[in-house]
Amino acid sequence: MKIVIINGSARKGNTLTAINAFIKGASEKNEIEIIEPDKLNIAPCKGCGVCQCSKGCVDKDDPNPTIDKIAAADMILFATPVYWWGMSAQLKLIIDKCYCRGLQLKNKKVGTIVVGGSPVDSIQYELIDKQFDCMAKYLSWDMLFKKSYYATARDELEKNKDSMNELEGIGKNL
């Protein structure tokens, strides 16, 4: 299976740690590519609608080839830290740019990893889950998993062996 991971974090912290644990389990049987929006030139969606009549966004920025990779994937893993009760701006930019290829993103397998600085029963995780639930319903996604983790210190998640084993197991069982 071809898996595209969109890393919504610009830092090399807990979100990346979670991604790496998932990859450790998934890499044996799957082809994996990581997209790092913070390293791309991305103009915000203008809402012009031209993309609905042509192939891709009129902006000649990095998301056009990036969205091709996402559209070609069998599975998309969205990984994000929590910023202001929502997903990171980096991840949201990529999601907004996917509007131009919405129908090509239908029927994908999807997973989410959300890492925040509040306990996992806090509203911030629920708000992010609801956004992804709405996208999943609209695009007929098969939501394989939604995982939320609490970690504030740089290496806190890595020290949580139960969480690391859980993420590795999810990857391995795909």
Model-derived regions: residue spans:
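N-terminal beta1-alpha1-beta2 submodule of the flavodoxin-like/Rossmannoid cofactor-binding fold
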Residues: 1-79, 85-101, 143-147, 157-174
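Acidic, low-complexity intrinsically disordered regions
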Residues: 80-81, 137
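Short, glycine-/small-residue-rich phosphate/pyrophosphate-handling segment
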Residues: 105-146
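Short, solvent-exposed loop/turn segments at secondary-structure boundaries
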Residues: 122-125, 155-160
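Active-site rim beta-loop-alpha module in soluble metabolic enzymes
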Residues: 151
